[in-house]
Amino acid sequence: KSVAGDTLCKMTIPSPSMLHLICCVRAEEYIPIERYQDMKDLYYDIAIAYQKVIRAFYDAGCRYLQLDDTSWGEFCDAEKRKTYKERGFDLDEIARSYVDMINLALEAKPEDMTVTMHICRGNFRSTWFSSGGYEPIAEILFGHCNVDGFFLEYDSERSGDFSPLRYIKDQKVVLGLITSKFPELEDKEDVKKRIEEAE
């Protein structure tokens, strides 16, 4: 705050669901400790930890926090869904648990603080690790998650069409129509048309 003054700055942190996905779902060697034999207890503790983190950022002067989350991009990918299913995971059930966990984390969010979510399919050296439209997670995430807005990757056909946006409630949506993966600029008129299409 002493540096930013009255300028609204955005801080980004991994979403609670990323913590769980990386440690407990992707990691095939994960074995729950005794306290977390019931996964609901772990979801709860992660959410409470995030409540404290959100408050700490607020007390430090942060009024705009973004949750970075690539787990939802994975949940859109048909091949990844198949792989997780073969390992015994029900991704729809996990997705509902993630939304509940995020909503619990946001329960103590002060009114004058904005929390948004950024969803993408990865971007490391202009490559990605998942593909697929938002339809598999749209109703669960867009229809029930209490963030103030979504930043959604829509820079290629890998992201599907705009129909999943029908589940958006009162949140703001930022469409990621400009790619960082290639040096060529998009045509301005094409970008305008895509925005109109999304409306």
Predicted segments, located by residue:
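Domain-level signal for soluble alpha/beta catalytic cores
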Residues: 1-199
